[in-house]
Amino acid sequence: MAAPGENLKINGDRLWNSLMDMAEIGPGVAGGNNRQTLTDEDGEGRHLFQKWCDAAGCSMGVDQMGNMFAMRPGTDPDALPVYVGSHLDTQPTGGKYDGVLGVLGGLE
């Protein structure tokens, strides 16, 4: 059995590029972002996240409130799931990594 984290692999270049791609949606002041909930920019960010999830082999669920749940099966069907949560939208003057770093870190 592998030690915890031994098989954890993060592609730093892909993570960085994904962050920068998302940052192009709704550019804000001083290098931040403005992807407020239910705006066109929020929808564009959600669409891009869906595309990345599809490429990673995830299935997607969306609840009545619009929360997205990306699910990827693990290699051990008896193992407990791992949950990671954050948000893709931002405050009006949100930072470039506001929420999205947690989302993409989980996907990575």
Model-assigned labels for residue ranges:
Residues 1-31, 73:
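N-terminal hydrophobic or amphipathic helices/low-complexity stretches enriched
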Residues 22, 84, 96-108:
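Alpha-helical metal-binding/catalytic segments enriched in His/Glu/Asp
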Residues 28-73:
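A non-catalytic alpha/beta surface segment that caps or lines the substrate-entry region
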Residues 80-93:
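Glycine/charged-rich beta-loop-alpha catalytic/anionic-binding loops adjacent to active sites
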